UniProtKB/Swiss-Prot annotation:
<dbReference type="GO" id="GO:0071949">
    <property type="term" value="F:FAD binding"/>
</dbReference>
<protein>
    <recommendedName>
        <fullName>2-heptyl-3-hydroxy-4(1H)-quinolone synthase</fullName>
        <ecNumber>1.14.13.182</ecNumber>
    </recommendedName>
</protein>
<dbReference type="InterPro" id="IPR044560">
    <property type="entry name" value="MOase"/>
</dbReference>
<comment type="similarity">
    <text>Belongs to the 3-hydroxybenzoate 6-hydroxylase family.</text>
</comment>
<keyword id="KW-0520">NAD</keyword>
<keyword id="KW-0673">Quorum sensing</keyword>
<keyword id="KW-0503">Monooxygenase</keyword>
<dbReference type="InterPro" id="IPR002938">
    <property type="entry name" value="FAD-bd"/>
</dbReference>
<dbReference type="GO" id="GO:0009372">
    <property type="term" value="P:quorum sensing"/>
</dbReference>
<dbReference type="InterPro" id="IPR036188">
    <property type="entry name" value="FAD/NAD-bd_sf"/>
</dbReference>
<dbReference type="GO" id="GO:0102164">
    <property type="term" value="F:2-heptyl-3-hydroxy-4(1H)-quinolone synthase activity"/>
</dbReference>
<keyword id="KW-0560">Oxidoreductase</keyword>
<comment type="function">
    <text>Involved in the terminal step of the biosynthesis of quinolone which in addition to serve as a potent signal for quorum sensing, chelates iron and promotes the formation of membrane vesicles (MVs). Catalyzes the hydroxylation of 2-heptyl-4-quinolone (C7-HHQ) to yield 2-heptyl-3-hydroxy-4-quinolone (PQS). PqsH is also able to hydroxylate HHQ analogs having alkyl side-chain lengths of 3 (C3-HHQ), 5 (C5-HHQ) and 9 (C9-HHQ) carbons, however catalytic efficiencies are significantly reduced for substrates with alkyl side-chain lengths below 7 carbons.</text>
</comment>
<dbReference type="Pfam" id="PF01494">
    <property type="entry name" value="FAD_binding_3"/>
</dbReference>
Length: 382
């Protein structure tokens, strides 16, 4: 029997690579008519790269993007709030920033294309004694030893595993764009915290910079008129920024790509049912404030493949969640807190936030970095 994966995003492709390496038969279906990554830039910290190194040549992957040493966080007046590395102090590599399509291309490279079907999705899952009988939208029926929902935050497989799941709106909306620019220090990303808004920037190629811009919104329903904003109108929201924030805001009108979405998260208790399991955003979508969403998907794929190879049975999926949920929940909560801090608006609250952030001891920051960057790949190597 085969393993069926739905979703040709980062999680699904990474898992297909892991199963290929392990010699396990798999079939991947993608409901879109083509494999086309949605988004602009992406960052991979050292824990993400360790998980990827199982099936990818990292030297080749680094040639697709730009090395990332860390991120500096600034106040809206341009003064420094804090600095955060992209790896543990002893890591031989830092992080990596690149276009999303470059990461997808790397994950697709070498995969058996005959095992990937686009324009196809799961329409029915029926439990068997030792398998799941899956009907696809093309009419074919497959008896599967394992079904994996890697189909993102709007997962349809999740309706089978966890029908009561609901997304929680973060109170922020976000625009992601690419501008033609090279930073003076291209290995350092930056984020500027203002009054209810943030502006981030990362070099993703020698001549392109990824920019993300968030605004606090007072609604719970996603995707309303806030999405219909031109780069020129978006830049005007950051007119009160000084220093490096002002420099980045002036680049926004030159955007060659502009993608908008609200920031949402998914927290709950049910990732598996029978021989069906969710991974990545389908299981635990989180706000992107720590840049760990893709890393969590890659860690999921790394661990699930290893556990399944050792014990290909339904109970393994329960073990998978047990081994992952504490780490996922910690990072989800930390990311949510960062987003909330960025939403503070009044002059008094912004002053208090900035003061408190500057007062955080370096030892506390190092402990946080240790927990962030010690993923399943590092644990397996120890």
């Amino acid at each position: 029997m085969t393993v069926l994966i739905q979703g040709a995003g980062i999680a699904g492709l990474a898992l297909a690579r892991e199963f290929t390496k392990a010699g396990i038969d798999w079939l991947l279906v993608e409901r879109a008519s083509e494999i086309r990554p949605i988004g602009t830039g992406i960052t991979l910290a050292s824990n993400a790269l360790t998980a990827l190194s199982s099936t990818l040549d990292l030297d080749r992957l680094f040639r697709r993007g730009m090395p990332l040493a860390g991120i500096n966080v600034y106040a809206h007046d341009g003064s420094m709030l804090m600095s955060m590395p992209s790896s543990l102090g002893g890591s031989s590599r830092g992080g990596l920033a690149l276009q999303r399509h470059e990461l997808h291309a790397a994950l697709l490279e070498g995969l058996d294309e005959s095992r990937i079907r686009v324009g196809v999705s799961i329409v029915q899952i029926l439990d068997g004694l030792d398998h799941e009988r899956v009907t696809l939208s093309d009419g074919t029926v497959h008896d599967c030893s394992l079904v994996v929902g890697a189909d993102g935050i709007r997962s349809s497989v999740r309706r089978y595993v966890w029908p009561e799941a609901t997304l929680r709106h973060s109170g922020e909306t976000c625009w992601r764009l690419v501008v033609p620019h090279r930073l003076e220090d291209a290995e350092l990303a930056g984020e500027v915290w203002g009054h209810g808004k943030r502006l981030g920037f990362i070099q993703i190629s020698p001549r392109e910079m990824y920019v993300y811009a968030t605004l606090k919104v007072r609604r719970e329903e996603p995707e309303d008129e806030e999405g219909f904003v031109t780069p020129q109108r978006l830049a005007a929201h950051y007119a009160d920024f000084d220093g490096i924030g002002a420099s980045i805001a002036r680049l926004i009108p030159s955007a060659t790509t502009l993608v908008h979405n609200d920031l949402e998260e998914l927290a709950g208790a049910s990732w598996c049912r029978g021989r069906v399991v969710l991974i990545g955003d389908a299981a635990h979508a989180m706000t992107p404030n720590l840049g760990q969403g893709a890393a969590m998907a890659l860690e999921d794929a790394f661990l699930l493949a290893r556990l399944w190879c050792l014990a290909p049975r339904a109970e393994t999926l329960i073990l998978f969640q047990q081994q992952r949920e504490a780490r996922i929940e910690f990072i989800r909560k930390q990311s949510w807190i960062v987003g909330r801090l960025g939403q503070w608006e009044s002059p008094w609250s912004v002053w208090l936030r900035n003061t408190l952030v500057r007062l955080v001891p370096n030892a506390s920051r190092r402990r946080l970095h240790q927990r962030l960057f010690t993923g399943v790949g590092e644990m397996a190597a120890q």
